UniProtKB/Swiss-Prot annotation:
Pathway involvement of the protein, from the record: Carbohydrate metabolism; tricarboxylic acid cycle; oxaloacetate from (S)-malate (quinone route): step 1/1
Source organism, top-level taxon: Bacteria
Catalytic activity field: (S)-malate + a quinone = a quinol + oxaloacetate
Protein name according to UniProt: Probable malate:quinone oxidoreductase 1
Any one GO molecular function term: L-malate dehydrogenase (quinone) activity
EC number from the UniProt entry: 1.1.5.4
Manganese among keywords: no
Organism: Staphylococcus epidermidis (strain ATCC 12228 / FDA PCI 1200)
Gene Ontology biological-process entries: tricarboxylic acid cycle
NCBIfam families tied to this protein: mal_quin_oxido (TIGR01320), PRK05257.1-1 (NF003603), PRK05257.1-3 (NF003604), PRK05257.1-4 (NF003605), PRK05257.2-1 (NF003606), PRK05257.3-2 (NF003611), PRK13339.1 (NF009875)
């Protein structure tokens, strides 16, 4: 085992959409910085960012009902929906900038217009959906949203969903043509190819073994070349851990105080994938339903048109599975090894409190294929068993942490952890994840490059014109920027 030493300005751990986005931003803002990226697999975007390991929804709250809460008085709080949409607007603006400047090309290889729709059954749910739409339509970001209970109109949008449906059940569906399907794996590959052209060191089959703080304030990152078994010690001023499910174990190695009292709970996702080309081509939408009362947000069922390498696909899910692995390509010991003296009570507290999640997971694990198809028939009444197969999607590690209110709170979002001095950042959590990559990386830059960020703002506004503003409060600006985005990304 040979050990070598090398110095750099920035180390990115993980070859997914988050590291690719941060690396791209840094090279635009401060091209002189030396950057090294390490990925354990043989190519980028193959774990959480892989097209089959996520639903590919450009999360904009156009169809996801869990982003709008219903009050006891029937009112609907759209605050989170607006925030999620604003985040995705930033991502689209940045991608459009990269296309315009020639840094990446062929947007149709990673983003497609696919209508986003919400689907509910039952009088109470229909009432909620109407209230949701009435609240959202007042906001410019949701101005194109439509709603219908008319069977003929719904049939024109999603004919397969109406075939064989009983006419006496109350249903309602919304339709928004501005929705998208995003292949984050393909986008990641484009971003990293661009980084390679800008002399960023891209190191595949390299595994990070340890991360230690040095006396001079820099970080020592110990990396193993899996091809040669050589071990390198890299010294870096800044480290970003964007390794999906592996981010938590790597963060724990840093021993920073912000890494204490945080745990992770892995959840595997299963989907039904359609094998019948006729069925696939007769549906063109991402249709999200409503989670059952008491079920976690990750359980929201959806029927998804996907585009994979130019081919149309159709998926339904998710169904939860369980594996103690933190990555699809991880170890069965990941969960056990993540339990430390400083987070044991945190983890146990969550286990006691999250009975609904435990109950949900047990019920999901016991589902037969026939029961999964029956769930699908809520969306497609005439779905046939032989047209569908079960596939395993990616692993997601839900964050468990202590809050001011209590110990062991399960978090269902995406979370950035930074060291006190801003020299290290880690990204934990799951949905909405990749869709919000640009906004999240701006957050990382603001927290970790405080002294430089102000001088970067003119360039940031060139790349993302609405940075620092809320498009929902600037109607004319939204329309102007959106025309540019539509032109370069070729979306609606």
């Amino acid at each position: 085992m040979n050990t070598q030493h090398s110095k750099t300005d920035v180390i990115l751990i993980g070859g997914g959409i988050m590291s690719a986005t941060l690396g791209t931003l840094l090279k635009e803002l401060t091209p002189e910085k030396d950057i090294q990226l390490f990925e354990r697999l043989s190519q980028p975007g193959e774990e959480s960012s892989n097209v089959w390991n996520n639903a590919g929804t450009g999360h904009s709250a156009l169809c996801e009902l869990n982003y709008t809460k219903e009050g006891k008085d029937g009112s609907v709080d759209i605050t989170k929906a607006i925030h999620i949409n604003e985040q995705f607007q930033l991502s689209k603006q940045f991608w459009a900038y990269l296309i315009r400047e020639g840094h990446i090309e062929s947007p149709d290889k990673f983003i497609q217009s696919v209508p986003h729709m919400s689907f509910v059954k039952g009088e109470e749910n229909v009432k909620f959906l109407k209230s949701r739409v009435a609240s959202l339509q007042k906001n410019v970001l949701f101005e194109k949203m439509k709603i219908s209970q008319d069977p003929e109109k719904i049939n024109s949008w999603v004919p397969l969903m109406m075939e064989g449906r009983q006419s006496d059940e109350a249903i309602a569906i919304t339709y928004d043509e501005t929705g998208t399907d995003v292949n984050f794996g393909a986008l990641t590959k484009k971003l990293i190819a661009n980084l390679q052209q800008k002399n960023v060191g891209i190191n595949y089959k390299h595994e990070v073994l340890d991360i230690k703080k040095l006396n001079n304030g820099n970080w020592q990152v110990v990396v193993k070349d899996l091809n040669t078994s050589n071990v390198m010690n890299y010294e870096s001023k800044f480290v970003f851990i964007g390794a999906g499910g592996a981010s938590l174990p790597l963060l724990q190695k840093t021993k920073i105080k912000e890494s204490k009292h945080i745990g992770g709970f892995p959840v595997s996702g299963l989907f039904l994938r359609c094998k019948n080309p006729d069925v696939i081509h007769r549906h063109h939408a991402k249709v999200y339903g409503k989670a059952e009362v008491g079920a976690p947000p990750m359980s929201v069922p959806h029927l998804d048109t996907r585009f994979v390498n130019g081919e149309k696909s159709l998926l339904f899910g998710p169904f939860a599975g369980f594996s103690p692995k933190f990555l699809k390509n991880g170890s069965y010991l990941d969960l056990v090894k993540s339990v430390k003296p400083n987070n044991m009570i945190t983890m146990l507290s969550a286990g006691v409190k999250e009975f609904n999640l435990t109950k949900y997971l047990v019920s999901q694990l016991m589902l037969s294929n026939e029961e999964r198809i029956n769930d699908l028939r809520v969306f497609l009444p005439e779905a046939k068993d032989e047209d569908w197969e079960v596939i395993t999607a990616g692993q997601r590690v839900q964050v468990i942490k202590d809050t001011d209110k209590s110990k062991g709170q399960l978090q269902f979002g995406t979370e950035v952890i930074t060291s006190e001095d801003g020299s290290l950042a880690a990204l934990l959590g799951a949905s909405p994840g990749a869709s919000t990559a640009v906004d999240i990386m701006f957050d990382v830059l603001q927290r970790c490059y405080k002294s430089e960020f102000k001088s970067w703002e003119p360039k940031i506004k060139e790349m993302v014109p609405s940075f620092g503003l809320k498009l929902s409060e600037h109607e004319d600006m939204y329309h102007s920027i959106n025309e540019e985005v539509k032109k370069y990304l070729n979306v609606k």
